[in-house]
Amino acid sequence: VKAARQPEKRLKLYDMESCPFCKSVREALTALGLDAEIYPCPRGGKRFRQEAKRIGGKEQFPLLVDPNHQVTMYESKAIVDYLFRTYGEMKTPAGYRPGGLRPLAGATGALLRLRRGSAVRAAEAPKQLLELWSFESSPYSRLVRERLTELELPYILHNIGKEQFADMGPAAMRVKPGPYKPKAGGRREQVLAKFG
């Protein structure tokens, strides 16, 4: 899957970190390299759950809002298909189609983490959106997303998924030997240039 062009206005995702259906949508966003504003909606949350209900008509997650096409939608399969069709200009690849064992695998991961990221904890709201550079399958980023969800802290998710074989493995122990070189023109190259 090649990275999509960023839309003029950021996508908005009302999401629960521990939900396997939300995970499918975040995986599609990572695959396409799309940034999104994430509005965490943990159980017992008060900050964005009512806003999501007002926008979509029900308290169900994931909820995607695309201001570029005036689209508001529920259901992970529909959202994933929409993202690949609209921004990837392609059919949803087999590896990203929800169904089969995908929800079970996502739910198992949440259970192993004792459903962290699913229940609200009190926190002060930030004055502006926080920003997170991450990718869905990163175990390090998951810890951060879990806490952001629990604290109902909205953030801009900048997806910097793996773009080449040299990106595989933890930063200190990559699969490919030698000095790390990000893919020329890729998102990881941009992040390294900006933040070092």
Where is each model-derived feature located?
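GST-like domain detector, emphasizing the conserved glutathione-binding G-site
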Residues: 1-196
